[in-house]
Amino acid sequence: MSLNLRRLTLPLIAGLGLLGSQFAAAEEEIDTLRFGIISTEASQNQEPLWRPFLDDMAESLGVEVEPFFANDYAAVIQAMRFDKIDLAWYGNKSAMEAVDRAGGEIFAQTVPENGEPGYWSLLIVHQDSPLESVEDVLANASELTFGNGDPNSTSGFLVPSYYVFAQNGVVASEIFKRTLNSNHETNALSVANRQVDVATFNTESMERLEMAHPDKAEQLKVIWQSPLIPSDPLVWREGLSEPMKTRLRDFILSYGETEEQREKIAPLQWAHFSASDNDQLLPIRQLELFKQRASIAGDDSLDAEERERLLAELDAQLDDLDERLKAREAADAEQAEAGVTTAMAQ
């Protein structure tokens, strides 16, 4: 390399290095962390429940933590897609959408205060309703108003869509006299006030309703409960800087160690958090594919060859998910056994 070229090249390399370090520093120096919160109830009710926890997060991370409330789950997913929020509390269904479409990544999972490994979807009716079962609902659907959940809700939409409707060969939007989509709280209050005949709900929201509106909770009757749903995940955007991810993970996974911290998240019905990853969504992905399969299998508008092709594709995806789920369960069992062995050795 000639001396003149060297004189030109070295400052250029140094300049590029400085520019790169400035970009890295800019990435790491976040003034405000934006936390998305799905709309299980009205935002004015959620703000005071979240504020103590978010204030502790801000103090620990050394940045402002700004909550982002929206009218529906899709708005929180879209906010992550366009980098308007940095992390979010989702249900499993909305987390799946965030991971697949919005550059999200699961890093933690809530642990319920009641010690349960998850929660359950419910169908509720008014206490005085003659409806006593799913069979009663389906038999009288043409005369009933149905309060369905947000389309991106796990317990309010996906789980009942499969277990209550798809497994019985029907689609909720097609069988009722009228169908409305609302958040959990609105659905419950609508049933209590006799504005809808039957609605989706969940056990976590039922506990909150019993604390906030015990008179309304007394007006509800549960006529169906789903299989267990995994606890809710926390999701950050993949583009968040690694230093911030580390600080955030350390804060979240240690939160709940003190009595004061547990008291602050008790209104959210959580005790602490555990580490998690995108594989938490495997059972939810199975459920989504099962629902699609049931829909295709019952679609008379498809010719036989096209139906078989689509079903074969879905079956292959289900087989793959089944293998991944078995591998994860085996790894979890092995880890749990190792933990027991270590504890006994001590």
What positions do the PLM features span?
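Pocket-flanking alpha-helical
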Residues: 68-105, 206-211
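Periplasmic-binding protein-like
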Residues: 34-39, 112-122, 214-249, 262, ...
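Bilobed "Venus flytrap"/periplasmic-binding protein-like clamshell domains
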Residues: 30-58, 70, 93, 113-189
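Bacterial N-terminal signal peptides
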Residues: 9-20
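A ligand-binding cleft/hinge motif common to bilobed small-molecule-binding domains
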Residues: 92-102, 165-166, 192-193, 197-218, ...
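Short helices/loops that flank or line small-molecule/ion binding pockets
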Residues: 74-88, 101, 119, 184-199
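An extracytoplasmic/periplasmic, membrane-proximal ligand-sensing/linker region
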Residues: 30, 42, 48-52, 247-346
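Hydrophobic residues within well-ordered alpha-helices
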Residues: 80-81, 137, 191-192, 234, ...
